[in-house]
């Protein structure tokens, strides 16, 4: 289920440019999405943090070649793109040697590469690109988020 607080802030711009979303997953895990186009001084600072019982992963779009792994029993590990300790899918999506930044266009190309493999009936991993079901779930999430906000920031159940 989701609970959303979406803000347009400007009468002449109907797009939601500031959002706070709470999520309850079917596994009893909880999540938070904070999105803002009005955060003073920020550029395109997309950050993804995932916290679990045994550790956490942190990734920042402005430093895309670094994945931070945190646990209670060890110092923070920094995993870098292009190194042999990464899995096959990660290495397949890396075109440059370690230390060379990959761009946003490369990430889009990786999605298209996976789609092309599927069309040609070549071997591919399901994580290479979103499925139709992923798209339907994404649209349901957007619709339920808007519904939650329009009904006064109430909890709304997702379809799947």
Annotate each language-model stretch with its function.
Residues 1-45, 133:
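Rossmann-like dinucleotide-binding domain that binds NAD(P)(H)
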Residues 147-160:
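C-terminal capping/lid region of NAD(P)-dependent oxidoreductase domains
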Residues 3-6, 20, 24-25, 48, ...:
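C-terminal glycine/acidic-rich active-site capping loop/insertion
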Residues 135-149:
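C-terminal hydrophobic helical "lid"/dimerization subdomain
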Residues 34, 51, 159:
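Residue-level detector of conserved, well-ordered beta-strand and adjacent loop positions
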Residues 134-137, 158-160:
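A short, charged, Gly/Pro-tolerant segment at domain boundaries
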Residues 45, 127, 151-153:
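Short secondary-structure junction motifs
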């Amino acid at each position: 289920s989701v609970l959303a607080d979406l803000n347009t802030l400007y009468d002449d711009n109907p797009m939601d440019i500031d959002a706070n979303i709470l999520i309850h997953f079917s596994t009893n895990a909880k999540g938070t999405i904070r999105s803002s186009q009005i955060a003073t001084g920020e550029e395109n600072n997309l950050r993804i943090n995932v916290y679990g019982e045994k550790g956490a992963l942190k990734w920042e779009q402005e430093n895309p070649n670094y994945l931070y792994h945190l646990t209670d029993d060890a110092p923070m590990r920094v995993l870098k793109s292009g190194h042999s300790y990464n899995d096959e899918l990660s290495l397949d999506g890396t075109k440059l040697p370690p230390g060379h930044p990959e761009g946003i266009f490369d990430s889009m190309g990786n999605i298209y590469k996976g789609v092309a493999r599927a069309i040609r009936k070549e071997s591919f991993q399901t994580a290479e690109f979103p499925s139709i079901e992923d798209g339907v779930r994404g649209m349901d999430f957007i619709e339920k988020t808007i519904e939650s906000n329009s009904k006064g920031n109430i909890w709304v159940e997702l379809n799947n």
